[in-house]
């Protein structure tokens, strides 16, 4: 679209999105956002202050408008230039093929099931027997502690009975006096 044929009044009525669509249509190639903003400012005769005031809304409109596509690295193009299948290819970075390495022998590939069974069937493990004996001793000691508690309870009961007997004998002696 040739913007020279329009009067300045007609250009002021054009939106920034319409101008960008025309600019990209004329160029027929993707352009960076900054270049698009500079061309819009030149075509519409906008000052830097006016551009700074409108740039956020322009970027939002550019994203929302379905006619434009962001190709990455801040480059914009017309969606009509890219068939749907090609969009992913253009936008996504292409993976680099990886070099194949020689497989090194590490010795871990030879797994023998017999080795695993040997660990379960080990006889004569004296450490385990010692541990069981130690546990038995601990349990016996704890049982002994319970016996001590029972003895204490019995002692308390005996003391209480003796105290009652003492109190009774004391009362009898007082009555005799």
Swiss-Prot record:
Bias kind Acidic residues: ranges: 106-177
PROSITE patterns for this protein: HTH_HARE
Keyword annotations from UniProtKB, A to Z: DNA-directed RNA polymerase, Nucleotidyltransferase, Transcription, Transferase
Pfam family, one: HARE-HTH
InterPro entries: Asxl_HARE-HTH (IPR007759), RNAP_delta_N_dom_sf (IPR038087), RpoE (IPR029757)
GO cellular component: DNA-directed RNA polymerase complex
GO BP term, example: DNA-templated transcription
Annotated GO MF terms: DNA-directed RNA polymerase activity
Domain HTH HARE-type positions: 14-81
Region (Disordered): 93-177
Listed NCBIfam families: RNAP_delt_lowGC
Function (record text): Participates in both the initiation and recycling phases of transcription. In the presence of the delta subunit, RNAP displays an increased specificity of transcription, a decreased affinity for nucleic acids, and an increased efficiency of RNA synthesis because of enhanced recycling.
Record text on subunit structure and interactions: RNAP is composed of a core of 2 alpha, a beta and a beta' subunits. The core is associated with a delta subunit and one of several sigma factors.
Family recorded in the similarity comment: Belongs to the RpoE family.
Protein name stated in the entry: Probable DNA-directed RNA polymerase subunit delta
């Amino acid at each position: 679209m040739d913007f020279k044929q329009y009067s300045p009044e007609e250009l002021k009525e054009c939106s920034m999105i319409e101008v960008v669509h025309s600019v990209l249509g004329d160029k027929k190639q993707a352009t960076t956002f900054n270049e698009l903003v500079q061309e819009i400012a030149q075509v519409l005769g906008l000052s830097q202050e006016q551009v700074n005031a409108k740039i956020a809304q322009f970027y939002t409109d550019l994203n929302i408008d379905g006619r434009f596509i962001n190709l990455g690295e801040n480059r914009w193009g017309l969606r009509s230039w890219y068939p749907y299948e090609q969009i992913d290819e253009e936008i996504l970075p292409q993976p680099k093929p990886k070099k194949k390495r020689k497989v090194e022998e590490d010795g871990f590939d030879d797994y023998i099931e017999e080795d695993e069974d040997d660990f379960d069937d080990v006889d004569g493990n004296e450490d385990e027997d010692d541990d069981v004996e130690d546990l038995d001793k601990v349990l016996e000691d704890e049982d002994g502690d319970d016996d001590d508690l029972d003895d204490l309870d019995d002692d308390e009961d005996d003391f209480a009975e003796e105290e009652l007997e003492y109190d009774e004998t004391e009362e009898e002696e007082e009555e005799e006096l």
